[in-house]
């Protein structure tokens, strides 16, 4: 069985043109319409009119300084509206924008700069030393630009790019279907990070698909047609495809984005109260922290009508807790990956608990068994996706790109799922993360969901380790809200062992101070397993 979402028409405009046209519309409706406000410093704000002008100025700086179509511009800064303005300017000048995690070490930064061949890099005061160290002996790097004041020479200030007259210079011709607009790097959970080539068409079609979906959902929860949120909180990092796309989508709608340089729980809750935030987007790690935070009772969050949780699996038990805490809020989950731009599935009001929803417009899916035959409803298999949001491929890795595709152009996701008769899809686990216990497959995510139901558990990571009698056995690393004693360990084991089949039973619990995750909240399961095994060896 193959499911198809609502059809979409192809767009023939570069994404920056689409956005610049919308900025003019926002400006005409309200010349004082604000695009961005910095959460930590509200005096640092930018209107849509100013944003449009800065994009033109920045694009002309790139052209005047000899940068060509296809050159790579790297964002290596914590979130800031200047990053978005610079990205739009670079796109208009024909450049590819890549983005690196602001928490990177110089080793990690060097890998991405060298792999992407980034010629110009945007930094802030926090990332500048790391980038400078990473760029040693990289002669192809031509310029570092800092959004912070008074950078050391030869680093130049961001203001240099925007303190110029617009001369209406000729810009390169863009082919939306084939030209790359964004080059984020995959998380590297299956090896070294790979550059993911996202085209102008990928972004434009994802915009159209998301707008249709969200408009339909707004109507379903009682909001008027074409309703525009007055404010939105933005703390998802722009180095991630989801973070960058949400910035595009929200600015397209004309919503004022309160942009966080770094995430801060109390500042988030304070701003929900201050701006009467209606819709909130979280990664699972932040959602779990919010569930366990006493600060939630300190602020009025009654304005919330919807909370979207994405970028990594969100356990059903955590979702239920969130609904108990915020009973009047619609919890929306979805499914996507960097290679799929933003999302392929999103929940609608009425979606069953535990699902990631149905296909967004323009998308098709099938689920394959191990023998290659197609699954029917409630049969478990691997999810394959086809749609206009599919990446062009991996940067300089044609063979690895081809290995992802089948003869019909569907892309394998590596995720184990099942669906019901309505196309509601349920994620079970990653293929490579399944634990084999006496030849039976155990999904870590299932065990994590049950463990999180226990009142003493704040966070958890489950993985498999070698076992002489069963092949592998599941181990849980747990962040406890209370004790780390044997009694707590036994209570957690009893909880899970009462609920699940014997072969899924946890045999060992290791208490830890934190669970390692990527910046977007994905569990670093392999890193947690390595740390566990290293600690075991050290005790021998």
Curated annotation (Swiss-Prot):
Q: Which SUPFAM superfamilies match?
A: Acetyl-CoA synthetase-like
**PROSITE patterns attached to this UniProt entry:** AMP_BINDING (PS00455)
Q: A Gene Ontology molecular-function term?
A: ligase activity
- Statement: the UniProt record of this protein carries the keyword Ribosomal protein: no
Q: Which UniProt keywords apply?
A: ATP-binding, Fatty acid biosynthesis, Fatty acid metabolism, Ligase, Lipid biosynthesis, Lipid metabolism, Nucleotide-binding, Peroxisome
Q: Which InterPro entries match?
A: AMP-bd_C, AMP-bd_C_sf, AMP-binding_CS, AMP-dep_synth/lig_dom, ANL_N_sf
Motif position, Microbody targeting signal: 538-540
Quote the subcellular location field of this record: Peroxisome
* Top-level taxon: Eukaryota
| Enzyme kind, highest EC tier | ligase
Q: Which GO terms describe its cellular component?
A: peroxisome
Q: Can you tell me which residues bind ATP? A: 186-194, 415, 430, 522
Q: In which tissues is it expressed?
A: Expressed in intestine.
Q: Which reaction does it catalyse?
A: nonanoate + ATP + CoA = nonanoyl-CoA + AMP + diphosphate; IC-asc-C7 + ATP + CoA = IC-asc-C7-CoA + AMP + diphosphate; IC-asc-C9 + ATP + CoA = IC-asc-C9-CoA + AMP + diphosphate
- Give its E.C. classification number: 6.2.1.-
- What's an example GO BP annotation here? ascaroside biosynthetic process
Q: Which family does it belong to?
A: Belongs to the ATP-dependent AMP-binding enzyme family.
**Described function:** Plays a role in ascaroside pheromones biosynthesis, which regulates development and behavior. Specifically, activates the side chain of medium-chain indol-3-carbonyl (IC)-ascarosides for shortening through beta-oxidation. Converts IC-asc-C7 and IC-asc-C9 into IC-asc-C7-CoA and IC-asc-C9-CoA, respectively. May play a role in fatty-acid metabolism by activating and converting nonanoate (C9) into nonanoyl-CoA (C9-CoA).
UniProt-recorded name of the protein: Acyl-CoA synthetase 7
